[in-house]
Amino acid sequence: GSDYTAAILAAALGAEVLEIWTDVDGFMTADPRVIPTAFTIDELSYDEATELCNFGAKVVYPPTIFPVCVRNIPILVRNTFNPNGRHTVIRRNAAPSSRLIRGISSIGETALVTVSGMSMVGVVGVNRRIFTTLAQAGISVFMVAQSASETSTSLAVTPADAQRACHILDAEFAQEIAAGAMNPAGCRTGLSTVAVVGENLRHHTGTVGRLFSVLGRNGIGVNAVALGALEMSVSFVIERPLLRKALNVLHDSFFMGNHEELNLFICGTGTVGDQ
């Protein structure tokens, strides 16, 4: 895309800054189409911006960040229709945030492919076979969750790739499945992925616990969860009908402080509130 082309040119020319003009006021704390109270994030690190983009934030084409990151060139993301409004600066050493997280992003349509079996415990090379098989088929995996017992590995893919992924994995492990050592690959659709991102995740204990406590109090079950290798993101898979609710309760918890919005319905036969 044009963002990526601009990034390559900026890196080649050693530009002082890369400006990307889009239709929103930079990166937001959440999707403003879903969360009306979402607001602009003033600064992000390269890693934080990459995580948000990888999990659904469509402000910047994800590969755009790497060429300028290597040359330590800041990125300014501005709104073409609001040039004097708030914007986001992406740089290596972003100013520390006073909040526990920087932002929340989501992938609306997710399928979960699960490879499981007792024979996976302690066996070297099973995951290598899984990822090699999927890579050779051109199937991208954007989240991985493995059980502590090593008996199952769940992979988040696009719904369009889900059935094909199951078929080729069943073919790869056909011998183990025939022997009863592994189960046929399982596939679940109708899911969504949510990611909570911020460098403060690695510095503040209890943030992940708070996240799942909020989800639990609101009756939102989690199907799979993964902690990013850089310890600045937590991603999890939920039922798609619960996505909007999950985004709202998490945004309220982490960004709105003690402020709480209530939906109030009043009815009456006459002038409501007259007495």
Locate the predicted segments by residue:
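C-terminal catalytic "cap/lid" subdomain
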Residues: 1-260
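Glycine-rich adenosine-cofactor-binding loop
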Residues: 262-275
